[in-house]
Regions:
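N-terminal amphipathic/basic leader segments beginning at the initiator methionine
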Residues: 1-37
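Short glycine-rich or small-residue beta-strand-to-loop segments that form or flank ligand, phosphate
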Residues: 43-45, 77-88, 115-119
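A glycine- and small-aliphatic-rich helix-loop capping segment at beta-alpha/alpha-beta transitions
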Residues: 65, 89-106, 161-170
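Gly/Ser/Thr-rich loops at beta-strand to alpha-helix junctions
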Residues: 82-93, 122-123, 149-153
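Catalytic-core regions of hydrolytic enzymes
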Residues: 112-144, 149
């Protein structure tokens, strides 16, 4: 069950309040700071080429966005949710990221960080939205971070683009089974930050890059078919770090 960041376009809209920053290794950051809701895209087109060699550099760029654009360092009580199915490689980004977290809730440390992976409704019989809402009532976080893999319409963004949004996530929207939006209003938190990386692309979108008419028609005949890179397992392992 795939999800897309709610109302977050593959290309951020041009705006006087949109800022773009370029870094080494072809990394670029586009920000939409219009209004109260902030969005950002960190595009790392060379990630699949350089891999672990630029891991530390990419981490620093991402940390900069989290701290300076989204101000998460001000949060004292943080709930981190790893969305997705750990048993499916292209949907396991959320749960795998949680494996690398330092959980401090109950240790008298600040900030207090707790984490959980709700799995998917097809495995649990419980809607993800309902699970997160109930956990949020128990924890009472001022910041909820939702980490997920999702679908994209652009081949160039596969496993190489980090998208941030304060709008929340509608679980299942990537495959037309969307439920209620997991937002700060629904969870009663001061802020909800969604972090997503595309690991799948629709066959119809992929077909736009194919010149062979017959093959293109075959892909277009399965509009809801989703494809992922053959090395998606390696990419998810790298991104989750």
């Amino acid at each position: 069950m795939k999800r897309r960041l709610t109302n977050l376009f593959d290309e951020l809209p041009n705006s006087k309040k949109s800022l773009e920053t370029n870094f080494e290794y072809g990394i670029s950051v586009s920000r939409n700071l219009k209004g109260k809701i902030r969005e950002a895209i960190v595009n790392v087109p060379t990630l699949n080429f350089f891999g672990a060699k630029i891991e530390k550099y990419v981490k620093n760029v991402l940390k900069n966005e989290l701290k300076n654009t989204f101000k998460i360092d001000k949060a004292k009580n943080i709930l981190i949710v790893g969305l997705g199915n750990i048993n499916i490689e292209n949907d396991s980004l959320g749960p795998k990221t949680l494996e690398r977290l330092i959980v401090s809730r109950g240790l008298n440390l600040s900030p207090s960080v707790c984490a959980f992976a709700p799995n998917v409704q097809s495995n649990t019989g419980i809607e993800t939205y309902e699970t997160i809402c109930q956990i949020s009532k128990i924890v009472s976080p001022d910041l909820v971070v939702l980490i997920d893999a999702f679908a994209t319409v652009s081949v160039s963004r596969l496993c190489s683009c980090f998208q941030f949004s304060e709008k929340g996530i509608a679980a299942g929207s990537g495959n037309n089974h969307a439920s209620k939006i997991i937002s700060k209003e629904a969870l009663g938190a001061r802020k909800v930050l969604s972090i997503g990386v595309p690991t799948l692309i629709y066959a119809s979108s992929f077909a736009k890059n194919i010149s062979n008419k017959k093959i293109k028609e075959e892909f277009n005949s399965f509009p809801m078919l989703m494809l992922s890179p053959t090395d998606v397992k390696k990419n998810v392992e790298l991104i989750s770090r």
